[in-house]
């Protein structure tokens, strides 16, 4: 239960179809201020719906929390305290852990790399052993548990909505740093995050937005002298993913990547248009043949427990059991 009590809670329903608004009203009544969007405005649009209402109410600090995030009892209070004590910081976020592996880091800040035109999460999948700094000043943080000053919004605006989904928080943080304010990831504020929306499980929805908005970001902010290198990076990356998709029989993924690239270079933003997102056509044959080739398999986590768990679940879907192994070496 949250130990910090000096706050008001706004819940934004982003045009859900499962009866969530009625369920929230029935369970929480006046304890939360419910806002129901008439259409799905994406991650950034959903956040901004609530942020704009809260901003008009005059709050000095505003916070974004994803629906698939679970906050530690001190998460909100410690972010507020950190901002109170660090005037140079424009926004601060929790230290994020994997929901399915709570002892391992999902994000403790992110770097934006204009040398290789990518982002990097330095602490991804690291085990929490208590040796990390109390906080870090970083290029960007995840918006799944993020607090921002009202004065920061005055300078850089609300979250960029043209992305619809993905890269919106990265761009927001980039603008914060560019405006002369720091972005912090705070270790004393902890949150668990499922991160389910970023996995391809049904269709190529995450692939489209991740690729299009990745390209859009660097096209927008890369210095002119580096544009040729940037273009080479995009084309090489696209060739690799498309080639692998065609080779593995994942034609819809390859198609989505090419369409995302085309939309990006033509400046198309917002919600994906028609014929951009397709059902997955995953080719399971190579994996099934791998599992059938031996009587037993072992997985060495090698500090990547989340990936190891996904391999185990894949085998389980094929009807095979995989034994966990703590040896330094493993068969798989």
Q: Model segments located where?
A:
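Short beta-strand-to-loop acidic/aromatic patch adjacent to the donor-nucleotide binding site
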Residues: 59-70
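Short, acidic, metal-binding catalytic loop of nucleotide-sugar glycosyltransferases
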Residues: 1-6
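Acidic/His-rich active-site region of diverse nucleotide-sugar glycosyltransferases
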Residues: 45-46, 70-156, 162
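Terminal low-complexity segments of carbohydrate-biosynthetic enzymes
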Residues: 212-213, 220, 235-332
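Active-site-adjacent helix/loop segment of glycosyltransferases
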Residues: 136, 182-265
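A short, conserved alpha-helix in the catalytic core of glycosyltransferases
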Residues: 139-158, 162-190
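A conserved acidic beta->alpha catalytic loop
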Residues: 13-22, 39
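Glycine-rich, basic loop-to-helix element that forms the pyrophosphate-binding segment
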Residues: 36-57
């Amino acid at each position: 239960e949250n130990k910090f009590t000096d706050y008001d809670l706004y819940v934004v329903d982003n045009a859900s179809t499962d009866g969530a608004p009625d369920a929230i009203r029935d369970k929480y009544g006046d304890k939360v201020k419910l806002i129901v969007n008439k259409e799905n405005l994406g991650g950034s649009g959903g956040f901004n719906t609530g942020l704009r209402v809260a901003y008009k109410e005059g709050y000095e600090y505003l916070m974004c929390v994803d629906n698939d995030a679970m906050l530690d009892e001190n998460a909100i209070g410690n972010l507020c305290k950190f901002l109170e004590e660090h005037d140079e910081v424009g926004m601060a976020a929790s230290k994020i852990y994997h929901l399915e592996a709570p002892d391992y880091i999902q994000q403790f800040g992110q770097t934006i790399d204009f040398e290789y035109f990518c982002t990097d999460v330095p602490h991804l999948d690291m085990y929490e052993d208590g040796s990390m700094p109390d906080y870090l000043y970083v290029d960007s943080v995840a918006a799944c548990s993020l607090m921002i000053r009202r004065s920061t919004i005055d300078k850089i605006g609300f979250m960029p909505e043209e992305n619809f989904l993905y890269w919106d928080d990265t761009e927001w943080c980039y603008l914060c740093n560019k405006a002369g304010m720091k972005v912090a990831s705070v270790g004393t504020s902890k949150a668990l995050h499922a991160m389910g929306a970023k996995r391809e499980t049904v269709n190529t929805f995450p692939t489209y937005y991740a690729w299009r908005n990745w390209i859009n970001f660097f096209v927008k902010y890369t210095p002119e002298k580096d544009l040729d290198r940037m273009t080479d990076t995009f084309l090489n990356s696209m060739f690799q993913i498309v080639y692998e998709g065609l080779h593995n029989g994942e034609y819809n993924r390859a198609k989505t990547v090419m369409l995302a690239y085309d939309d990006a270079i033509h400046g198309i933003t917002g919600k994906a248009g028609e014929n951009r997102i397709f059902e997955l056509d995953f080719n399971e044959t190579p994996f099934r043949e791998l599992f059938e080739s031996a009587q037993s398999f072992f997985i060495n986590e090698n500090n990547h427990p989340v990936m190891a768990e996904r391999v185990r679940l894949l085998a389980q879907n094929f009807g095979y059991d995989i034994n966990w192994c703590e040896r330094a070496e493993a068969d798989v």
